[in-house]
Amino acid sequence: MNFGIIQFPGSNCEQDCFHVISNVIKQNCRYIWHDSKSLRGIDCVIVPGGFSYGDYLRTGAIAAQSKISYEIKEFAKRGGTVIGICNGFQILTELKLLPGVLLRNKSLNFVCKDTYIKIENSSTRFTQLYNQDAVIKIPIAHAEGNYYLTKKELSTIRKRNQIIFSYCDEFGISSETANPNGSILNIAGLSNEEGNVLGLMPHPERVSENILGSTDGINLFKSIVNFLN
């Protein structure tokens, strides 16, 4: 199994992802620089968190114009597995691989804390090792995580079960209090219609080892391996 982790100027979570893939779940992994023109031999692309290009213009906007982003789009169109975490999620929306946009947090502040999220769809390649409606605790760290889309788009993704994760309390109840950024319907992560592209704001790579106090995030990566095998 070969994972490719994209590196943009300003990315800062690629090493965490690399460690989890290489040292925790023991899969082949390599970095792919933003001006590369090939994803040859890659089974799963990870677009990590950070501040690509300093978040200038708009989060993810400049990264979406890079050479590797064209390759990511083509890879996804062929059915390749793609996951975007935090800034990676923002980039995937800029690439139109996922619907909607990520706006400034409702509080207008950078938010860095643990959040509870509910598994809304456990039948995907990203969540098949989680139980349906399970509640896991995953940290967030972002200023633009306020997910928004039109009413028509929202109706569509609900009908197609594209909502994968939602913010909730420790009992699995969604509320405004449990929503850290103002995201519509408390959405924390969703997939494309085909189910091969996932974007989420929480950082599963930061809770994938016991030494970090939790392994709630590891099953996301293991689910991908399980599916692709």
Feature-to-residue mapping (PLM):
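Short, flexible active-site-adjacent loop segments at beta-strand->alpha-helix junctions, enriched
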Residues: G88-F89, S123
